[in-house]
């Protein structure tokens, strides 16, 4: 490929999505090494360039067609799209798929001594946030007037510092809120990481590479969500045992040497096989039960 046909993928330089994004691409067979002093990493085995940038720059780079793909949190993506629509700037993109990491929620939170009934309890109050557009949309939908306090970081300290009456911030476990004397009151947006593509027309060779990468991403995520199950089962309870395997599709049943009363079952399960299920399998006569992770899947 020529330089212009190299696939450019924007990922977060550092932060919660950086490691997961790199691991996903490596699991898809993209070989690269990261030099912390450089913003661009060139793949060794594919015509792919990784641009390591701030997460809030990724949506704009994709929407402006500077890069072809971006891995970004849906919260950042939605925030930037609303901002660009307000400013009449390009705001189009194609979401290729949601990923299986980066889960978080954008929530309202108030001091523990605050009496909160519903979102209308915040009428006329000042709310600190790093996501003013998502907050504004939510409050407008609820017809609630409020004052905003825009902060780029450390939003959770705003009430104690006297800067705001409450906050709207990302929450994972709630431990940070509790440490700052706050409690979560309402979720206004749930987010996962996703892959987005520019709406610009791609050269056939580049689009073929995008499709190839997406196919591998689908396979990696499907493998992560699946388990390979092997067990021995008596033929008299075979149907009951197969019915117990969660999410199993067309398990393979093989005869055992020198044992006409038992068979081997191989199955791919798309759900977790919990201990109670394994105990039920054992009660039906299953033995040698193995549950193994799957590295890759295709087809």
From Swiss-Prot:
The keyword ATP-binding applies. GO terms for molecular function: ATP binding; ATP phosphoribosyltransferase activity; magnesium ion binding. Its cofactor is Mg(2+). Its EC number is 2.4.2.17. GO terms for biological process: L-histidine biosynthetic process. Keywords: Amino-acid biosynthesis, ATP-binding, Cytoplasm, Glycosyltransferase, Histidine biosynthesis, Magnesium, Metal-binding, Nucleotide-binding, Transferase. It is found in: Cytoplasm. PROSITE patterns: ATP_P_PHORIBOSYLTR. It catalyses: 1-(5-phospho-beta-D-ribosyl)-ATP + diphosphate = 5-phospho-alpha-D-ribose 1-diphosphate + ATP. Pathway: Amino-acid biosynthesis; L-histidine biosynthesis; L-histidine from 5-phospho-alpha-D-ribose 1-diphosphate: step 1/9. The keyword Protein transport does not apply. One of its GO terms (cellular component) is cytoplasm. It holds the Pfam family HisG. Feedback inhibited by histidine. Gene3D superfamilies: 3.30.70.120, Periplasmic binding protein-like II. Belongs to the ATP phosphoribosyltransferase family. Long subfamily. Catalyzes the condensation of ATP and 5-phosphoribose 1-diphosphate to form N'-(5'-phosphoribosyl)-ATP (PR-ATP). Has a crucial role in the pathway because the rate of histidine biosynthesis seems to be controlled primarily by regulation of HisG enzymatic activity. This is ATP phosphoribosyltransferase.
């Amino acid at each position: 490929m020529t330089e212009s046909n190299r696939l450019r993928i924007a990922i977060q330089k550092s932060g919660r999505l950086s490691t997961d994004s790199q691991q996903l691409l490596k699991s898809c067979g993209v070989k690269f090494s990261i030099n912390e002093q450089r913003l661009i990493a060139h793949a060794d085995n594919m015509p792919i360039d990784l641009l390591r940038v701030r997460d809030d720059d990724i949506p704009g780079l994709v929407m402006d067609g500077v890069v072809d793909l971006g891995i970004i949190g849906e919260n950042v993506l939605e925030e930037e799209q609303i901002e660009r629509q307000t400013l009449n700037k390009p705001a189009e993109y194609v979401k290729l798929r949601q990923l299986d990491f980066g889960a978080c929620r954008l929530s309202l939170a108030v001091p523990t001594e605050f009496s909160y009934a519903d979102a209308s309890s915040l009428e006329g109050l000042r709310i600190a946030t790093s996501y003013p557009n998502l907050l504004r949309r939510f409050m407008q939908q609820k017809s609630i007037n409020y004052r905003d306090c825009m902060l780029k970081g450390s939003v959770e300290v705003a009430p104690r510092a006297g800067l705001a009456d409450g906050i709207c911030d990302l929450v994972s476990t709630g431990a940070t809120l509790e440490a700052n004397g706050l409690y979560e009151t309402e979720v206004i947006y749930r987010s996962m990481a996703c892959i987005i593509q520019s709406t610009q027309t791609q050269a056939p060779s580049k689009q073929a590479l995008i499709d190839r990468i997406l196919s591998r991403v689908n396979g990696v995520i499907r493998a992560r969500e699946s388990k390979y199950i092997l067990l021995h089962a008596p033929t008299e309870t075979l149907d009951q045992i197969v019915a117990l395997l969660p999410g199993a599709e067309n398990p393979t049943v093989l005869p055992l040497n020198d044992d006409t009363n038992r068979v081997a079952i191989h199955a791919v399960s798309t759900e977790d096989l919990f201990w109670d299920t394994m105990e039920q399998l054992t009660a039906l006569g299953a033995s040698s039960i193995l549950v193994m992770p799957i590295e890759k899947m295709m087809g």
